[in-house]
């Protein structure tokens, strides 16, 4: 994920991030299934999706902690 995309994610609301997180988890499931059946064309996509999931979870957690401080 590029820095520009990361800034866009940080500026979006938690509901949108949760929806995006669900979409990425579904995509990761499909990619793993394709890997197991030998149909996966781009194995690097798994790494990219996992990294995006981690970044979104981090953003959600940061917002949660920020809300607790206030």
From Swiss-Prot:
One GO term describing the cellular component: cytosolic large ribosomal subunit
Biological processes per GO annotation: translation
Molecular function via GO: structural constituent of ribosome
InterPro entries named among the record's database cross-references: Ribosomal_protein_uL29 (IPR050063), Ribosomal_uL29 (IPR001854), Ribosomal_uL29_CS (IPR018254), Ribosomal_uL29_sf (IPR036049)
Domain of life: Bacteria
CDD domains, per the entry: Ribosomal_L29_HIP
UniProt keyword Cell inner membrane present: no
Keywords attached to this entry: Ribonucleoprotein, Ribosomal protein
SUPFAM superfamilies named in the record: Ribosomal protein L29 (L29p)
Keyword Ribonucleoprotein: yes
PANTHER family noted in UniProt: 60S RIBOSOMAL PROTEIN L35/50S RIBOSOMAL PROTEIN L29 (PTHR10916), LARGE RIBOSOMAL SUBUNIT PROTEIN UL29C (PTHR10916:SF0)
Family to which this protein belongs: Belongs to the universal ribosomal protein uL29 family.
Protein name according to UniProt: Large ribosomal subunit protein uL29
Organism the protein comes from: Clostridium beijerinckii (strain ATCC 51743 / NCIMB 8052) (Clostridium acetobutylicum)
């Amino acid at each position: 994920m590029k820095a520009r995309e990361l800034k866009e994610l940080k500026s979006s609301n938690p509901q949108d991030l949760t929806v995006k997180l669900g979409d990425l988890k579904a995509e990761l499931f499909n990619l793993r299934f394709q890997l197991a059946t030998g149909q996966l064309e781009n194995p690097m996509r798994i790494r990219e999706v996992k990294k995006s999931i981690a970044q979104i979870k981090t953003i959600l957690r940061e917002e949660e902690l920020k809300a607790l401080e206030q």
